[in-house]
Amino acid sequence: MKQILDFIPLIIFFALYKMYDIYTATGALIIATAIQLVVTYALYKKVEKMQLITFIMVTVFGGMTIFLHDDNFIKWKVTIVYCVFAAGLIIAHILGKPVIKGMLGKEVTLPDDKWTKINHAWVLFFTVCAIANLYVAFEMPLDVWVNFKVFGLLGLTFLYTLFTGMYVYKHMPKEKKEEQE
């Protein structure tokens, strides 16, 4: 349910972009993301930092897109969010507070070096996505960027999450694997 809530604003953005324009879609994205936060809090009594960061970025860059009537701001938002996530993982690692281990460590037991590899892999993933977004956003037509943002980046994230899960499963202690099966 929680994952579905995360995708609703993106689906609304895509639908309204196709029906109207980038500015209508951006306004709807801001509203849908705000509603998503409220619903998430009402259901789970908690909002994750990633959701909050995304909401702030959507509101700031989406607001600038609408107010200045310039779609470059919403395009930059995607790259900046990925850079913030990558930087957050790097800083947390330096401070000795591995974020991914904190998210999954209660359900999954792995050696610290494996958590570090996963952390570094996600830093690389977010960095590559940020660069790819810059290229597509500013070298391709707006329609291509919207499709890339909605389907390309979403698909890449899904696949990378799947590969991370396979890596985690491969390195889980044998008794934990048997519990999972």
Curated annotation (Swiss-Prot):
It comes from the Bacteria. Keywords: Cell inner membrane, Cell membrane, Membrane, Transmembrane, Transmembrane helix. InterPro entries: YciB. GO terms for cellular component: plasma membrane. It is found in: Cell inner membrane. It is a multi-pass membrane protein. The chain crosses the membrane at residues 22-42, 50-70, 80-100, 122-142, 148-168. Belongs to the YciB family. Plays a role in cell envelope biogenesis, maintenance of cell envelope integrity and membrane homeostasis. PANTHER family: INNER MEMBRANE-SPANNING PROTEIN YCIB, INTRACELLULAR SEPTATION PROTEIN A-RELATED. This is Inner membrane-spanning protein YciB. It comes from Aliivibrio fischeri (strain ATCC 700601 / ES114) (Vibrio fischeri). The gene is yciB.
